[in-house]
Regions:
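Terminal low-complexity segments of carbohydrate-biosynthetic enzymes
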Residues: 121-122, 129-203
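A structural motif corresponding to the C-terminal lobe/cap of the Radical SAM core domain
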Residues: 1-138, 142, 149
């Protein structure tokens, strides 16, 4: 699987991934296993969700027979612990706590910008990308991104390490690096807001 992801990256396609936690077959170390795979594969944008059992699906019917359904799902299985609308095999508090910790680890600046570097180590600018002249708004967007991530953001040192690595080692990948950095920054903001909201919620 790691080789397959690297091959896709080598064709100039950045892989994004969606991952689900909460299956009956998940072992207690599922959080470490997912983190290890995402980091080693260099999947910059990784969306992690908790398993939901939608009504009228085979999963719902099986869990209903087993007496494990708790109610309707929230409708959002990403960054919402209420998505877990059934009794999981792993203890629920253990599952939710591990889920939050996995999100926290994945979107630290060091981890997330490190995955961009890992992705772009194999990256080859595709030949089919249309060449166009640089516009004024391109320059404005780049400087806004550099200001936001390189000056205002906590963990900006990790961003500058990535930036200068790309400038000197993989300059053709700079546009893709900036694109991925912007997406990752959005994920960092959303993840922080989720964890802050959950930590402030009454238990």
């Amino acid at each position: 699987m790691l080789r397959s992801v690297a091959t896709i990256h080598s064709f100039g396609i950045s892989v994004m991934g969606g991952f689900i936690i909460g299956f009956d077959a998940d072992p207690p170390e599922i959080f470490d296993l997912q983190e290890q795979f995402i980091e080693e594969a260099g999947i910059a944008v990784a969306m992690i969700g908790l398993l939901s059992a939608p009504p009228h699906t085979p999963l719902w019917k099986r869990l209903e027979k087993e007496g494990r359904i708790l109610g309707l799902p929230s409708g959002n299985n990403s960054m919402d612990e209420n998505a877990l609308n059934f009794i999981p095999r792993l203890e629920r508090d253990f599952l939710v706590t591990g889920y939050k910790e996995l999100l926290r680890k994945l979107y630290t600046p060091e981890a997330s910008f490190g995955r961009i570097r890992k992705c772009l180590e194999h990256y080859k600018t595709p030949d089919f990308v249309a060449k166009r002249p640089v516009k004024l708004y391109d320059i404005k967007a780049m400087f806004l991104l550099l200001w936001t991530l390189g000056i205002c953001m906590e963990g900006r040192l990790a961003f500058w390490k990535l930036f200068f690595y790309i400038v000197f080692k993989k300059p053709a990948a700079l546009p893709e690096m900036l694109h991925l950095a912007a997406m990752v920054h959005h994920c960092q903001i959303v993840t922080k807001a989720f964890l802050r909201r959950e930590n402030s919620s009454p238990t």
